[in-house]
């Protein structure tokens, strides 16, 4: 019996580039980025140490994308990002409402924040007129009963499933910056096991708030360096100093190849394998030897029935933090072992262009990897002017690269040592 082949037939993304993956793809190939000056609300200009981010401009969101019965105040920002990305992916796939009825929905979203603040803001048109906690208690009859659940971690998956009328499995993934990739990987495994034929998988997140960005800064993860301006995110560069936070979401439609072809869909790429591991090293830092990352990549390749030398591209986690980039480079070199193998590899870091989307990061990066397989074009790593001596691979610095990409890996590594790697391949009629 031939193994079930699983393909990507729909994609949707919300990033600082906007609300369409097609525009994001073209702008990233052109070497653009969406990082700009940012400061949290309620803080005096220049007082907050983190001054750059890659926010989504909600004012530019087309009105038709807000078509959800709960779009109002009970949907906070990250859930809105996820809903828009998921519905865009479904529209892109050409699936009808009837075809979605048994779909699985797997999503990842970040840790809840601002729950009380959002309740207060929901009672005022102007944030300056939001009531105090005492006034909230006195006006509790006016509070939307759903608001107490509006930021629960399973909220996003439920909103998507409810909105599309799916009665299939609904699963929330909570694994930090590896979340969206794990959602996609688990969806891939569910389809391969025969539990479902169709899944919508991805994630959404927003950490652009005073409390969350303060936490990232105190953790030593977020860069407060000012001298590079909007070129601050510089993965693998000697002067990298920390991540630049972004926000948004991404979702893909995965289905069996048999089902996709039967309904006339054209796959973007094929999902070949999935690997997941834990560093078991330190909650605030990756294993400097990259052992967990090596294991995740090796598991993905073994799952796909591939050897390391068959890989053409690695879409790196590439956070622009001193620890991650060195450890990930070492992990790649360890996996490929032979110098001639890793020297011909292409490696790219999408976060240099749209920042770190935290729990959602793996989803748009997975899409960009699929597009690289489809189009044989790889987005650049920006701002890599002075490579760290520990980071000595081909990172596609400064400009997009045109080269055949038959097999690729997309890596996502989360706080606490959570690692995922997804293996993708160029779609072709005959199986590998």
Language model: regions and residue ranges:
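Glycine-/small-residue-rich "gating" segment that lines the acyl/pantetheine channel
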Residues: 37, 127-144, 185, 189, ...
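Active-site-proximal gating segment of KS-fold condensing enzymes and close homologs
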Residues: 111-171, 213, 217-221, 324-339
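Acyl-CoA/ACP chain-elongation machinery
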Residues: 195-241, 275-288, 318-325, 342-394
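ACP-dependent fatty acid/polyketide chain-elongation machinery
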Residues: 1-71, 93, 258-268, 367-382, ...
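A glycine- and small-residue-enriched flexible loop/hinge segment at structural boundaries
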Residues: 8, 40-95, 107, 114-116, ...
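Condensing-enzyme catalytic core mediating Claisen C-C bond formation in acyl metabolism
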Residues: 5-9, 32-37, 227-304, 312-313, ...
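Active-site-proximal alpha-helical scaffold in enzymes
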Residues: 82-95, 153-157, 161-164, 170-205, ...
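Active-site pocket-shaping loop/turn-to-helix segments
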Residues: 13-16, 23, 66-84, 111, ...
């Amino acid at each position: 019996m031939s193994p079930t082949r699983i393909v990507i037939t729909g994609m949707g993304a919300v990033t600082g580039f906007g609300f369409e993956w097609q525009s994001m793809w073209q702008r990233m190939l052109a070497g653009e980025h969406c990082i700009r000056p940012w400061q949290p609300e309620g803080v005096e200009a220049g007082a907050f140490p983190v001054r750059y981010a890659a926010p989504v401009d909600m004012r530019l969101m087309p009105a038709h994308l807000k078509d959800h019965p709960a779009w109002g105040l009970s949907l906070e920002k990250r859930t809105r990002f996820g809903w828009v990305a998921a519905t865009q992916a479904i529209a892109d796939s050409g699936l009808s409402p009837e075809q979605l009825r048994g779909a699985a929905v797997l999503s990842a979203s970040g840790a809840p924040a601002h729950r009380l603040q959002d309740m207060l803001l929901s009672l005022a048109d102007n944030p300056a007129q939001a009531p105090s906690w005492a006034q909230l208690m006195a006006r509790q009859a006016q509070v939307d009963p759903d608001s107490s659940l509006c930021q629960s971690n399973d909220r996003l998956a439920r909103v998507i499933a409810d909105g599309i009328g799916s009665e299939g499995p609904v699963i929330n993934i909570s694994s930090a910056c590896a979340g969206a990739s794990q959602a996609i990987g688990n969806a891939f495994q569910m389809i391969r096991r025969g539990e479902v034929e169709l899944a919508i998988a991805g994630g959404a997140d927003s950490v652009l708030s005073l409390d969350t960005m303060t936490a990232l800064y105190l953790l030593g993860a977020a860069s407060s360096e000012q001298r590079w301006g909007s070129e601050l995110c510089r993965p693998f560069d000697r002067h990298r100093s920390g991540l630049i936070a972004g926000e948004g979401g991404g979702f893909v439609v995965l289905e069996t190849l048999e089902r996709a072809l039967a309904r006339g869909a054209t796959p973007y790429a094929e999902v070949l394998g999935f690997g997941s591991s834990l560093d078991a090293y330190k909650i605030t830092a990756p294993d400097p030897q990259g052992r967990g990352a090596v294991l995740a990549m090796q598991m993905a390749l073994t799952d796909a029935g591939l050897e390391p030398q068959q890989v053409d591209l690695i879409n790196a986690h590439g956070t622009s933090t001193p620890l991650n980039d060195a450890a990930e480079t070492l992990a790649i070199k360890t996996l490929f072992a032979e110098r001639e193998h890793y020297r011909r590899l292409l490696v790219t870091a999408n976060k240099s262009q749209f920042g770190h989307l935290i729990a959602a990061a793996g989803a748009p990066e997975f899409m960009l990897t699929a597009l690289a397989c489809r189009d044989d074009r790889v987005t650049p790593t920006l701002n890599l002017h002075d490579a760290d001596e520990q980071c000595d691979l081909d990172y596609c610095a400064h400009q997009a690269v045109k080269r055949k990409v038959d097999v690729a890996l997309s890596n996502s590594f989360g706080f606490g040592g959570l690692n995922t790697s997804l293996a993708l391949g160029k779609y072709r009629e005959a199986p590998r």
